[in-house]
Amino acid sequence: MTIADVAAEAGLSKTAVSMILNERTGTGLSQETAKRVREIAKRLDYRPDPSARALRIGTTPTIGFVSDDVTLTRYASAMIRGILDVAEENEHTVLLAETGHHPERLSGALNAMLDRRVSALVFGSMAARRVELPQLPSDVPVIMVNATTFVDYPVVLPDERTAGEAIARLLIDAGHREIALIGRRYDEDLPPEVSVTISDRFAGLDAVMEEHGLEWAWEEAFDYWAPDDGYRAAKRALSSGARFTAMVCLTDNVSFGAYQALQEAGIRIPDQVSIASFDDDEISTYLRPQLTTARLPYEEMGRTAMSLALDGNRGTDRHLVPMPIIRRGSIRSR
């Protein structure tokens, strides 16, 4: 049914019916008449034409979400769930597009969404890094989630510094003073195209160690945070003769490798060495003992980004989302 059908049955003009159904003031009609029009529209199963609405107001109740590879990774469900939940709560729909790190796909996806008159755009990345976006219209709000760009759009990122502080403090409060750090990356080796947040993670760890007058008992840097890297680094830490009762691994994947090296050497976790990590990857629950880790808050970042998009936020603020510490069995008090 069309608005003309509703108007004909109500005995009113299409303009008057449109104003009532769009809850606009100034119709000059009584509340009883407005109620009757809504009842007729419901009975006739009238649905507004989104294309007509878009032509009238310039946008649709639709948000565009474009990512580099979020939808193809294990992190997809949490971030997208957060985005979709907030959109649904506010009666909006979401268009999803994946670029696979191809610049030509990125431009095409963004243009396609702009052609559909989305009311805002959200760009998301699996790794918190700087990305290059094409020039976008100034009248469309753009929100960056787990990513930054060269334009000062609102940014939603995990609060890595506070998480680093919390992990270091957790081990120190448990009585550990000799702590190894596995997976260091230095700023000069960590361009923003790789990460814009990991340096904050190190800063938080280092700040708490310094606050307590402590130095790392063993420290090793490497370029990738894969299980093999964690395994080899932990083996070298053990063979170095360094004394440590706890270990911080920069990711759960690194922790997985460190677990293997320690357990091969007959070292019991956490009885002899406690381990804490970051990310809360699925693997953290399969390790034995289960791994204590700081969770990357993908769902909450998605929710925050969508809320900003719905608000039409055009500021330049950086919104930091807390990383909760998930306490499991890999830390023992001394």
Residue spans for each PLM region:
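Bacterial carbohydrate/catabolite-sensing allosteric modules
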Residues: R43, D85-N90, S138-M144, T148-R334
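Short acidic/polar active-site loop segments enriched in Thr and Asp
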Residues: S13, P61, S119, R177-E178, ...
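N-terminal helix-turn-helix DNA-binding module of bacterial transcription factors
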Residues: M1-P61
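Short amphipathic alpha-helical segment that frequently serves as the phosphate-/nucleotide-binding helix
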Residues: A34, S77-R81, F202
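Glycine-/small-residue-rich active-site loops that bind phosphorylated ligands and cofactors
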Residues: T25, T71-L72, H101-H102, A128, ...
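Short beta-strand segments enriched in small/hydrophobic residues
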Residues: A16-M19, R56-V70, E178-P191
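Short gly/ser/thr-rich secondary-structure transition/capping motifs
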Residues: R43-D49, E104, F123-M126, Y231, ...
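Alpha-helical recognition/docking segments in bacterial nutrient-uptake
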Residues: T2, I57-R169, D173
